[in-house]
A protein has these predicted regions:
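Intrinsically disordered, low-complexity, positively biased terminal segments
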Residues: 1-141
């Protein structure tokens, strides 16, 4: 048996295994610690995502229903809306967590289908404001 251990950055930079329909090798990602957004509106306020154009997030969160729904990001503030004319980015809270906290890039999440939009260019200004390195969770007990 051959074992190759890659730096975590390789796993997130090129989602090779996720794109293969039937991989001939087994790739195992050993989770260390996990993060989860439990208040998307508060997180976006802290991140100060002041983008020039309004965009919308359509978030699914089955575990925390208050955290899911449709939101508009306008002037650095995320507000819940019923409907919107703004370009929409949709996906689960896990994918939004990975993107907004810098674990995965938007392009990678779009490529694997974890996030979906018809207008990816509209979300590049948001992506440009985000941290470009993986988060470090130093408290482990």
């Amino acid at each position: 048996m051959f074992t190759y251990e890659a730096p975590t950055a390789d796993v997130t930079a090129v989602p090779v295994v996720q794109l293969m329909t039937e991989p001939k090798y087994q790739a195992v990602v050993k989770p260390y610690m996990q993060a989860r957004i439990v208040n998307l509106e508060a997180l976006c306020q802290v991140l100060e995502l002041d983008v020039p154009e309004t965009v919308a997030f359509d978030v699914q969160d089955e575990t925390a229903p208050w955290n899911g729904g449709r939101f508009e990001l306008r002037g650095g503030t995320l507000e819940r809306v019923v409907q919107t004319e703004a370009p929409q980015l949709s996906g689960g809270i896990q994918a939004f967590t990975q993107w907004l906290l810098g674990y995965k890039r938007l392009s990678s999440l779009l490529l694997t289908g974890e996030l979906r939009t018809n207008t990816p260019a509209d979300f590049e200004p948001v992506d440009a404001l985000l941290t470009r390195q993986q988060p470090v969770l130093a408290d482990y007990f």
